[in-house]
Structures are given as structure tokens and as C-alpha cells.
Amino acid sequence: MKWENIILCTALLTAITTACKKGSSGGNQPPPVGKKVIVTTFAGDGTDAYLDGPLLSAQFHTPIDIAISSDGILYVADYNGRRIRKISGGQVSVLAGDGNFGSRDGAGDTAQFVDPYRIEAAPEGNIFVMDQADSRVRRITASGIVSTYAGTGVAGFKDGDVSVALFREGMGGIAVGSQGDIYVDDTNNGRIRKISAAGQVSTFAGKASKGFVDGDTSVAEFLNPNAILFDKQGNMYVADNGNYCIRKITPAGKVSRFTGTATVGTADGGPGIAQFHYIYDMVLDKDGNLLLSDGDRIRKVTPSGEVSTIAGSTTGYADGDGPEAKFNYPAGLAIDTDGNLYVADAMNNRVRKISFK
């Protein structure tokens, strides 16, 4: 990793930790009656290194994001390892990346990444990777062939064909739309970008000026959007981290504040009370709730915008019941068909599993 990227990541983590300490604290709310939240370690022995093998003896080098395919295979963006790891059949292996710094396309074990920061599994079997410091979106087929899907490696802003489109360094979330289009949080450009199945990049929401403005997608403003997802009705939810809230974009193209007070903190409660400080990722459960990683906590947001903390409290490492469990920069999330939640616990170099019983 380039030294400037190391400094950037360190500064980011410091800022997150500081924000957490400064924000007002809300007590953890208990899980719903009849539901117990259990946190366990699913993969990784906690060593900051690279080693394939059985789940609990495998090693990761800052696992930053996680995705699950339609056939139940887990994929992990091993950020500082510059690899995409695969978890299947109780074993951890490499899908793509040779561990060296670069942007080379090709077969899995010869391809290279700069900073594989975000990962998303598409229904047809492709894996999309946000190579953030390289300003590219990469695609990996099920057989492990890596190609550049959009972006040139030059940081900037430009819509158009995927071969000439430009993104800024530090891209955030990625989501797959119902028509197969790819949506990207172009965080430092303050925009949500759309990559159509036909290979055209356009601006879906946001503009050059950054701030907080609701309204049509063409006039709306965001400040460091970092995670996106769609619900079953086609609404997009955006973690607008610079504004410390979650925004909602309807299929009609209207942007509004969904929940959060725009004040940094960890308070639980309704849309006008709840606080956030840094949402890394969001997933949707079968009941339509948003599950999100926010600081050292895993939180739930109901369809009405009510926020509660279901696991985690202070920084550390501990399995157990939700409120007693500890994480160290829980980042990417993925949910399986049984409702189990998988967490890329980045600074603990582990993949954690949250079961609801």
C-alpha cells in the first residue's frame, strides 16, 4: 500500500474513534422478545497475516468487506492482503489477487489490486470490487477472471462510457439494482453514480457541491455518502456519513432524510433522536429492517426509522450475547438466507457471525 494510503486509513480510523468518544451515548436496546443475539467467530484466528485453510486457523490481513453469493459462498475483500478471499465448505481460499500492489487484470492468481475496499455479489455470479485508491470498479467472474468494469485509474469526475468514465479515489458503497445496473457511492465527488448494463456511467443523485439538500436527485446534496442498498420496493438508502444520517431515494427520484439527527453520536431511538457517527455498510433483513455497522456497534433500523443497537459496545474482541460482544472496526456485512449476519471485523482480522435465536 502507498504510504499516503496508510496515512489516510490511519487518519480515518482515528477520526471514527474520536467521533465515537465525542458523541452522546445511547444505551443498547434489548433484542425483540423471543430473539437472542449471539455473536461468534466464524473465520480467522486474529493474526494480521495471510493464510488459507480451515475457518478458524485461516488468517486475514484487514478483512474490510464481505459479500455472499446466491449459492451461499462468502467472499471477503482482504484489504491489506490485496486479495479477494473465498469461504466455502469450511475452508478459506483465494479467489483473486496475488497480494502485490497493482491493477493487472487476468486469471485470479495473477490479477492484482491496489486497495480492494468494497465487494458485492451480483445474482448472475459476478463479483464486483471497488478498488478505491485505483479509482476503478473491477469485476470477477465465478471462475476467478478479473477485468476492469469501469474507470481508467485516473481520479476525477466524468460520465460516459465505462472506458472513459472517471471516479474519485475513496469510493464507498456498491449495490446491484433490479435491472442489473451497478450503483456506486462516489464518495469524494458527493454523488451516487450508475453503471448501466449497457456500459454507460451516469450520475444517479448528487452534484458537485457537497452539503445537505433534499429534493429531486438532480438538486440533492450529500456529504461523504459511504454505503447504499435497495429495499424490495426499489427505494435506495444512503449512509450520508458527513451528515450523520441515512437518506432515502424513492423510485420517483425524491431524496429525503430517513433517520438520524445530523449530530454525531450513538443514541438509539426514533428518526428525530437517533444518532450515527460512521456507517460502513448496510444490509436488509427478511423483515425489511436495515442492519448496519456503525463504529464498534451493529445496529438495526426498522422500516419506520427506529434505531436500536443489537451487538457491540466498546472497542475490543469478545464473543457472546449481543450487548457483551465486542468488535474492532466492524465494516462489511452480509446476510444469508437463514438470516445469519456476517461481519468483516477488520481490525480483529476475523469474520464474525451473528445469529438470532
Write out the residue ranges for each language-model feature.
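Residue-level detector of Asp-centered blade-edge/turn motifs that repeat once per structural unit
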Residues: 68-71, 121-124, 176-179, 230-233, ...
